[in-house]
């Protein structure tokens, strides 16, 4: 099974290399333009994945205090899991089965399943808080005249607020009562899956109940771990904004320079990442979100009054960074040290 995931990752890299929207000559020109800035652009993800791993480790230790899973192992599974998420046909989901399979060797299948589900929930929960907070950042920048505001933009922001509030309600129900059993039951309404759903619930009723209990227990019994994990995931999104800021600075876009100029540039980067990730996650079923991320960057950067060419450059460099980290992830898959 490990080799299957490895081959999937390799195939994904090949596909990504041949699905760039520019020729290899143009790609090389973009890379040359990025120059030494590629080092912090790629390197900042060492910190981002480290924060993700700490968030997941917090959940694992809360669920299984006697478990002796090293931070390096969690860090490795974090990077590899995200590499597979980029690569799989069901974008954003492929890494979870691999994480469960590997972590089961350390803490057992049920605890591994609940911890991976809890971390995936936390990952998306933090996304919604990131999108929610970006609305108020946009409004603050609009209030000082830095960004436009009109009826269309106000309506769009209102829709996002409602979307996030609905998500907060769903997550609160999931964290209080568990959601695995409900998801399996809901799948029974999908044509062709009714018999499978009923059979799965019947054969695994006790395991599903135990996993849901473990999910609900995190918030009910260890709120400190819950909020620490959430904060780490949220802050990792904030740090991710620096990746785009590096590229804006590369083009000399610093909003006048100085502390205030750099702060506004960072907030612009925050909004660019927020819109792009929202756009990509809404259409997350595409493998490697091909074309979606690129479109998100171009639209979000253009909305801030910057050139579409800059949006294309940012999307290409981010795609290169993804390929580099997918390669790192699939290589780490071959490292079995715990």
Residue ranges: model-predicted function:
Residues 1-79, 148-280, 312-314, 321-338:
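Predominantly cytoplasmic-facing regulatory/coupling regions of multi-pass membrane proteins
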Residues 52, 56, 88-93, 123-134, ...:
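Alpha-helical transmembrane segments and their lipid-water interface positions
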Residues 71-73, 106-121, 307-317:
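Membrane-interface alpha-helices at helix entry/exit sites of multi-pass transporters
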Residues 75-106, 202-212:
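Extended non-transmembrane interhelical loops and adjacent amphipathic helices
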Residues 83-90, 271-294:
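Transmembrane alpha-helix interface/packing and boundary motifs in multi-pass membrane proteins
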Residues 131-145, 303:
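Transmembrane alpha-helix termini and helix-breaking/packing motifs in multi-pass membrane transporters
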């Amino acid at each position: 099974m490990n080799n299957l995931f490895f081959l999937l990752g390799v195939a994904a890299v090949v596909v990504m290399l041949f699905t760039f929207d520019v020729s290899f000559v143009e790609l090389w020109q973009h890379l040359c333009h990025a120059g030494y800035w590629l080092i912090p652009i790629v390197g900042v993800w060492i910190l981002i994945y480290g924060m993700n791993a700490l968030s997941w480790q917090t959940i694992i230790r809360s669920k299984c205090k006697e478990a002796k899973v090293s931070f390096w192992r969690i860090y490795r599974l974090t990077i590899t899991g995200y590499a597979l998420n980029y690569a799989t046909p069901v974008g954003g989901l492929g890494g979870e089965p691999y994480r469960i399979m590997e972590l089961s060797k350390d803490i057992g299948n049920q605890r591994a399943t609940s911890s991976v589900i809890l971390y995936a929930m936390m990952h998306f929960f933090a996304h919604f808080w990131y999108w929610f907070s970006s609305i108020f950042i946009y409004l603050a920048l609009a209030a000082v005249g830095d960004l436009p505001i009109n009826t269309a933009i106000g309506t769009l922001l209102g829709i996002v607020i409602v979307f996030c509030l609905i998500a907060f309600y769903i997550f609160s129900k999931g964290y209080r009562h568990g959601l695995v059993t409900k998801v399996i039951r809901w799948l029974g309404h999908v044509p062709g899956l009714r018999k499978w759903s009923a059979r799965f619930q019947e054969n695994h009723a006790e395991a599903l109940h135990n996993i849901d209990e473990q999910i609900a227990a995190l918030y009910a019994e260890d709120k400190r771990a819950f909020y620490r994990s959430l904060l780490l995931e949220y802050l990792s999104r904030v740090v991710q904004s620096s990746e785009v800021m590096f590229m804006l600075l590369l083009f000399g876009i610093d909003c006048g320079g100085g502390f205030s100029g750099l702060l506004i540039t960072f907030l612009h980067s925050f909004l660019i990442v927020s819109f792009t990730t929202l756009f990509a996650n809404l259409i997350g079923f595409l493998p490697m979100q091909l074309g979606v991320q690129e479109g998100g960057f171009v639209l979000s950067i253009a909305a801030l009054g910057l050139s579409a060419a800059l949006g294309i450059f940012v999307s290409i460099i981010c795609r290169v960074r993804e390929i580099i980290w997918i390669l790192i992830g699939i290589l780490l898959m071959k490292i079995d040290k715990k």
